[in-house]
Regions:
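Non-cytosolic coordination micro-motifs
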Residues: 103-165
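Sec-dependent N-terminal signal peptides
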Residues: 3-13
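Long, charged/polar, surface-exposed segments that mediate recognition or autoinhibition
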Residues: 62-127
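N-terminal leader/targeting segments
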Residues: 16-84, 88-91
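Short, flexible coil/linker elements and helix-boundary hinge sites characteristic
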Residues: 12-13, 34, 145
Length: 165
């Protein structure tokens, strides 16, 4: 009985450590997208968000799941008042994937602050000018021990980042 407080403390600490990564990802979504904290729910060891509405100025269906050291995002255009060009949609959603992954995959990367600084982000491989560049094939790369994958098709983008070591 005298060890009960210690056991409870260790249990709470373990739960808080597991929630820290998920909470940080939720915070990025809160700042960079229309997905807010109320769109998230727990399912097993994952935090899942489902959002249908305007995001980045486009009506879309966005789904995200976060486990410890793993992020998955799927964005798909849903019929709405504004239909973007497929290439524009691919660019917007690719940029969002890069923005969400960046604080975790390349936390020390500093975005350029002057017009003549052309230091590329290690995640720039995710960006495309048009869908013809991708030919609907997934692009994968390992960056700082994270396996990054992005796949685009007409009006749909899926991306994931998973810590591999």
């Amino acid at each position: 009985m005298k060890y009960l407080p210690l056991i409870l403390l260790l249990t709470v600490t373990t739960v808080q450590a597991a929630d820290t990564f998920q909470q940080k990802v939720k915070d990025v979504f809160q700042k960079k997208t229309s997905v807010d904290y109320t769109d998230w729910y727990g399912k097993g060891d994952a935090a899942i968000a489902e959002f249908k509405g305007f995001n980045l100025g486009v009506y879309q269906d966005l789904k995200a799941s976060v486990r410890d050291n793993e992020i998955n995002i799927k964005m798909q255009y849903v019929t709405g008042p504004v239909r973007p060009d497929s290439d524009d949609f691919a660019q917007m959603t690719s940029a969002l994937c890069e923005t969400v992954f960046e604080p975790f995959v390349v936390p020390d990367y500093v975005r350029p602050t002057s017009w003549d600084d052309d230091t590329p982000s290690p995640l720039n491989f995710m960006y495309v000018d048009n869908l013809k560049q991708t030919e609907d094939d997934p692009v994968e790369k390992t960056v700082n021990g994270w396996k990054i994958k992005i796949e685009r098709s007409v009006m749909k983008t899926t991306c994931s980042a998973r810590k591999v070591n």
